[in-house]
């Protein structure tokens, strides 16, 4: 079996949470950290090296640069400024972070890298689209974390509401990873059964609205309380990396380039995708209610309007 190499660009809280989770899963034989801040880069490498003896697989953790990426299989990008406390939206990060992403994309392209890239920098759908356009890489090999974490929050909220395990919940959030995202309640299920089977509420729509409100406010509440979110996205993206590198063909909600699905083209947003060694191997278009479709159309338009601001 080929030894795998995973690189991290941006050694902030999100990036290092991803790498630590990846190491805990024994994903690779070598991990490389790239960061413009050498002090932080080396400090995080030292800290992660100390975790190697307790990890399930022996691995090397090194500080490196873009020139070394040619030999790597997988890149995770977490670089960029995070949201500020006080209710800053992800889209408000666009102006500064898009220039950072353009520079990263150029450097990765020049390195000769041929593997798969997973991006979590916000606003993630536009950052992933920017990276795709600047690099010119195959669309299936450029993936945004999209509404992966939103969907995990939805599953958690449903499980908590009905006293079930989140592993038995099948539910998705589509569209922008942001305020215009759409919770797909119409097809949500627990152990194959619709949610109404478990609800005792007289007004089930109100109950669903409360769940939706919870997941929309979750990130803002975490940021207000501790300054940033990173454990949830770190674990979720490490799982995506594992599904890809182990070629499992499992479905997760990530952002991929849309080409006709949901009536949209040339935009990236969260939707269920089959993941394997080629990255996104299939984009799944799930059935939506009229209200959900209208919400997704609005979310797509929000993304398209903001893509123009990226000046690609």
UniProtKB/Swiss-Prot annotation:
Residues annotated as binding substrate: 83, 90, 122-125, 150-153, 229
Catalyzed reactions per annotation: (S)-lactate + NAD(+) = pyruvate + NADH + H(+)
Taxonomic superkingdom: Bacteria
Assembly behavior: Homotetramer.
UniProt xrefs under SUPFAM superfamilies: LDH C-terminal domain-like, NAD(P)-binding Rossmann-fold domains
GO BP, sorted A to Z: glycolytic process; lactate metabolic process
CC annotations in GO: cytoplasm; membrane
EC assignment: 1.1.1.27
Protein's job: Catalyzes the conversion of lactate to pyruvate.
Top EC class for this record: oxidoreductase
Localization per Swiss-Prot or TrEMBL: Cytoplasm
Involved pathway(s): Fermentation; pyruvate fermentation to lactate; (S)-lactate from pyruvate: step 1/1
Phosphotyrosine modifications at: 220
Binding site for NAD(+): 14, 35, 66, 120-122, 145
Similarity-based family: Belongs to the LDH/MDH superfamily. LDH family.
Organism: Mycoplasma pneumoniae (strain ATCC 29342 / M129 / Subtype 1)
Swiss-Prot/TrEMBL keywords: Cytoplasm, NAD, Oxidoreductase, Phosphoprotein
Name this polypeptide is given: L-lactate dehydrogenase
Annotated Pfam families: Ldh_1_C (PF02866), Ldh_1_N (PF00056)
Active-site residues, record numbering mapped to chain: 177
Presence of keyword Secreted: no
